[in-house]
Amino acid sequence: MNFGIIIPAYNEAESIGVTLQSLLNQTYLPYQIIVVDDGSTDTTAEVVNQIATQYPVVQLVQRSEKGEHLPGAKIVQTFNYGLPYLKEAVEVICKFDADLIFPNNYLETMCQQYNENPQLGMFGGFCYIERNGSWVLENLTNKDHLRGAVKSYRKACFEAIGGLKIAMGWDTADELLARY
């Protein structure tokens, strides 16, 4: 299964390298990783380019146009900017935040779930945060809600729901559209 990962990034120089390394160290490797730099003023682009020289699966796309400043719109606009760069062979489209550290079996687990459940259109995961030296579950949303920070879509599902909506609540709208 070919995973195409799009990572919107803005001033993520301190975290994007760790995020990319956690994806490149997976037991099941991604087919393509696109980092869309949304006009960062730090060294985000340089960090990504340095990694991309060692790993051809990583590609930097720079977005200089300014999108609408509506709640929830900017992240989706930046993600959408990366969509045309996905290769045709991508079977699962992933939208991941730029400040995540993935367990080394994350993509393998995701692949297994998609393979075992042909009707599965979306898959996500839990987010943990470091608090006082320990990793604890971030309880911002209901456990059956797929967090916007870490979402994947079977390509057919993504196309059927018409992609991500440029609006506040995009990460709930996609789930509702996929269910109904």
Where are these regions (language model features)?
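A short, conserved alpha-helix in the catalytic core of glycosyltransferases
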Residues: 157-160, 167-180
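N-proximal low-complexity "stem/linker" segments adjacent to membrane-targeting elements
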Residues: 1-25
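Active-site nucleotide-sugar/metal-binding loop of Leloir-type enzymes
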Residues: 76-92
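Conserved donor NDP-sugar-binding/catalytic core segment of glycosyltransferases
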Residues: 101-137
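Conserved nucleotide-sugar donor-binding
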Residues: 147-162
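Acidic donor-binding segment of Leloir-type glycosyltransferases
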Residues: 20-67
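Short beta-strand-to-loop acidic/aromatic patch adjacent to the donor-nucleotide binding site
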Residues: 89-101
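Cell-envelope/extracellular polymer assembly enzymes that use nucleotide-activated donors
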Residues: 2-4, 32, 173
